Amino acid sequence: MLKRRIIPCLDVKEGRVVKGIEFVQLRDIGDPVEIAKYYDESGADELVFLDITASTERRQTMLDVVSAVARKVFIPLTVGGGIRSLEDISSLLKAGADKVSLNTLAVESPSLIREAADRFGSQCIVVAIDVKFKDGEYYVYTYGGKQKTDLLAVEWAKQVAALGAGELLVTSMNQDGKQSGYDLSILEQLREVVDIPIIASGGAGNAEHVVEALEKVDAALLASILHDRKTTVEEVKHVCKSHNLPMRFVSTKMD
């Protein structure tokens, strides 16, 4: 059985890690390189690095920061934000990213998902879906959660999986930063329609919330509770293991 993954998320703005609530009210957390190194040494399975204002500011992701982070960590690194072309993807992979996360570009140019998967391999193409529950439906949002689309999350997920995406990163905007639990409903709906791995994001407040998500999907993205040192990656994994979820530990004796 594949191990479930715990993935710290570094939302980066102007070269600093930040965290907000419902994609706003951002506060400074610290230096991305040092934070990434800490999580790597703490037993994280992967890292996600999101340049959260690159798309809205219509500029490229900070390649120098990505490169600096990649030099310090030895676990898979996914990078997203401001990607507008296959050349941007190539630049990020050359800078040290193992995977790239596409959101706005994927919505505006779906064919690029297939092109990217064909050129670089599905395993390194993650499609990020920012969803908000509104008027009884889960809608897809772009440009860092600022622009609502007419796309329904379930239909969009099926489409991107068919186009060759290797993984979905699903963030509930309603739950983001609130630490009240993941939106399990959308995770269940997506699990029923796609076979590719799903990463749950938005809402983790404790290890039990992570357990709830990992009983439905493959990986959990965490930010606030780790950044604020309310818990650690290792502690979360122990709780997950106690619920019979397969986890990877830094110390093989715990595996």
Curated annotation (Swiss-Prot):
Pathway: Amino-acid biosynthesis; L-histidine biosynthesis; L-histidine from 5-phospho-alpha-D-ribose 1-diphosphate: step 5/9. It is an enzyme of class 4 (lyase). It holds the Pfam family His_biosynth. It comes from the Bacteria. One of its GO terms (cellular component) is cytoplasm. It is found in: Cytoplasm. Keywords: Amino-acid biosynthesis, Cytoplasm, Histidine biosynthesis, Lyase. SUPFAM superfamilies: Ribulose-phoshate binding barrel. Its EC number is 4.3.2.10. One of its GO terms (biological process) is L-histidine biosynthetic process. GO terms for molecular function: imidazoleglycerol-phosphate synthase activity; lyase activity. It catalyses: 5-[(5-phospho-1-deoxy-D-ribulos-1-ylimino)methylamino]-1-(5-phospho-beta-D-ribosyl)imidazole-4-carboxamide + L-glutamine = D-erythro-1-(imidazol-4-yl)glycerol 3-phosphate + 5-amino-1-(5-phospho-beta-D-ribosyl)imidazole-4-carboxamide + L-glutamate + H(+). The active site is at residues 11, 130. NCBIfam families: hisF. Heterodimer of HisH and HisF. Belongs to the HisA/HisF family. IGPS catalyzes the conversion of PRFAR and glutamine to IGP, AICAR and glutamate. The HisF subunit catalyzes the cyclization activity that produces IGP and AICAR from PRFAR using the ammonia provided by the HisH subunit. This is Imidazole glycerol phosphate synthase subunit HisF.
